[in-house]
Swiss-Prot record:
Residues 22-45 form a propeptide. Pore-forming protein that forms cations-selective hydrophilic pores of around 1 nm and causes cytolysis. Pore formation is a multi-step process that involves specific recognition of membrane sphingomyelin (but neither cholesterol nor phosphatidylcholine) using aromatic rich region and adjacent phosphocholine (POC) binding site, firm binding to the membrane (mainly driven by hydrophobic interactions) accompanied by the transfer of the N-terminal region to the lipid-water interface and finally pore formation after oligomerization of monomers. Residues 1-21 form the signal peptide. GO terms for cellular component: extracellular region; nematocyst; other organism cell membrane; pore complex. Residues 58-77 are annotated as: N-terminal region. Composed of a long N-terminal alpha-helix and a core region rich in beta-sheet structures. Before the pore formation, the alpha-helix binds the lipid membrane, partitions into the lipid-water interface and stabilizes the monomeric molecule on the membrane. Finally, it traverses the bilayer, thus forming the transmembrane pore. This is DELTA-thalatoxin-Avl1a. InterPro entries: Actinoporin_PFT, Anemon_actinoporin-like, Cytolysin/lectin. GO terms for molecular function: channel activity; toxin activity. It comes from Actineria villosa. SUPFAM superfamilies: Cytolysin/lectin.
């Protein structure tokens, strides 16, 4: 009997602390399980989902995220990271991108729900070419109209400067050279380095945006209800 009591005591002494410790190992978050340490301060930092070609929560869009995306492109003389926050109350579906010069290594995010933001990048063509990253992207909105965003990061800053623009077109309209020329030359393009606010004139929407002035350009735009 005495041997049984000693055995029971040793069993309980070993098993009880282990059982309590396990309660701190697994924490549920939604439908996922994350393995954590007992000390919450030692939890691993979550990896950011902010990569070019992705859609993130609109509230997360900031210039520092665009800086991170630019760093991932590498050493290219002319490049741009674009973030467009959809606070329009509408769903956006990608149409296309037209390039006056340059290209992109990522696909334009296909769907952007309300309260989400799209991330996109463009760069000058590879090789020793004196070209910039210049073009326009287009999204069809659930209202039936088209949202167009023009961006221009020129190669020669002696003659040109960074410009951007936004316009809502009636109906579905794919980006092309005509759209680019209109937004660059005839629709009051926006200069860099200052925050711009503008009524877009359709669907009860307005914009708020900012573009940096250097060759590693960042363009952040919020499309909101007026």
């Amino acid at each position: 009997m005495r041997h049984f009591v000693v055995f029971l005591y040793m069993f309980l002494a070993l098993s009880i602390p282990t059982a309590f410790a396990k309660k701190h190992i697994v924490t549920k978050k939604g439908n996922h399980q994350d393995i954590t340490n007992d000390n919450e301060g030692e939890n691993a930092e979550k990896k950011s989902a902010a990569v070019a070609g992705a859609v993130i929560a609109g509230g997360e869009l900031a210039l520092k995220i665009l800086t991170k995306i630019l760093d991932e492109i590498g050493k290219i003389d002319r490049k741009i990271a674009i973030g467009v926050d959809n606070e329009s109350g509408l769903k956006w579906t990608a149409l296309n991108t037209y390039y006056k010069s340059g290209a992109s290594d990522v696909t334009l995010p296909y769907e952007v729900e309300n309260s989400k933001a799209l991330l996109y990048t463009a760069r000058k063509s590879k090789g020793p070419v004196a070209r910039g990253a210049v073009g326009v992207l287009a999204y069809k909105m659930s209202s039936g109209n088209t949202l167009a965003v023009m961006f221009s990061v020129p190669f020669d800053y002696n003659l040109y400067s960074n410009w951007w623009n936004v316009k809502i077109y009636d109906g579905e309209k794919k980006a092309d050279e005509k759209m680019y020329n209109e937004l660059y030359n005839n629709n009051n393009p926006i200069k860099p380095s200052t925050w711009e606010k503008r009524d877009l004139g359709k669907d009860g929407l307005k914009l708020r945006g900012f573009m940096t002035s250097n060759g590693d350009a960042k363009l952040v735009i919020h499309i909101e209800k007026s």
